[in-house]
Every structure is written in C-alpha cells, then in structure tokens.
Amino acid sequence: MIRELEVTDIDEYYMKLLCQLSGKEKEYIWQDMWPFWLRYENNDHHQTFVYEDKGRVIGTASALIEHKFLHYGSSVGHIEDVVVDKHSRLSGVGKGLIEECVEFCKKGKCYKVILDCSKENIPFYESCGFQYSENCMRKDLIDG
C-alpha cells in the first residue's frame, strides 16, 4: 500500500532503508531527525511517499515542487530519494512510488517532472515513462 510518510514511520527500518540508497551505514537517532520532520511536515510543496507491506516500510520516494520564473511562473516537479528494500526490488514497488510522485506533481500543476539517476537505473525510469535528457552536474559541499 502506498501512502504519505507519517512521523511514526521514521524508525530504525526507515532509516536503514535510506542507508541502502546512500550506501553509507549511519546510526540515526530519532531526536536528531525531529527538526527535519517539523520542517517537512509544514511544506505543501514536498511530499514523501512510502510503500508499506505487512506493517513495514519497504520503499520510499519524495516529490518536490519548484516554482519557476520561466514558463510564466509555472512549476517543475523533482523526484528524489527513491529506494526500495533490496529484498523487495523488481516487484512493482518502485514503479508505484514513481507513479504516486508524478501524480503529486500533476496536482501541483508542474509542466514537467525531472530526476537524477545512475546509469544502471536509466532502464527502470524509462519503463516509468521518463526519457533521457541532458546531463547532471554535481559539487559536494560537505564530506560524507
């Protein structure tokens, strides 16, 4: 079942799921995450979805809406932090999360939805209706 992230989801399993995306094991403490939750909770232009199976979150993805000066003040949707538990991949979980993010962006009247991904994930996103466009550049500002 896909639904919006709730404060009670941010637990040991959810944080370990995010670690699968970053590739870095880090011990997260709930109290440290509280300021982020408060900032997130009151933002109508950012939504995180989770896929819950048997009471456990096995996938997550976020959608953000950016307002632009271009295109007469319309908006662009961004999809970020897409991850499915390594034991649940290739089961439709990721595709469902992407569809939910795209719907959120449509409701936000976005004229396009964009995302960054690794070369290995291009076929997956193409299967979700995305097409390769341009390049991504990056500059890390914080180590680790």
Q: Where are these predicted regions, by residue range?
A:
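A short beta-loop-alpha structural element at the N-terminal edge
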Residues: M1-Y14
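Active-site rim helix/loop that mediates acceptor-substrate recognition in acyltransferases
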Residues: E27-T48
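Conserved acetyl-CoA-binding loop-helix of GNAT-fold acetyltransferases
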Residues: V84, L90-E103
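Conserved beta-strand in the GNAT
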Residues: V50, R56-I65, V83
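Conserved beta-strand-loop-alpha-helix junction that forms the acyl-donor binding cleft
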Residues: V113-P123, R138-I142
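A conserved beta-turn-beta hairpin within the catalytic core of GNAT-like acetyltransferases
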Residues: H67-I79, R89
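Conserved GNAT acetyl-CoA-binding A-motif
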Residues: I98, C105-C117
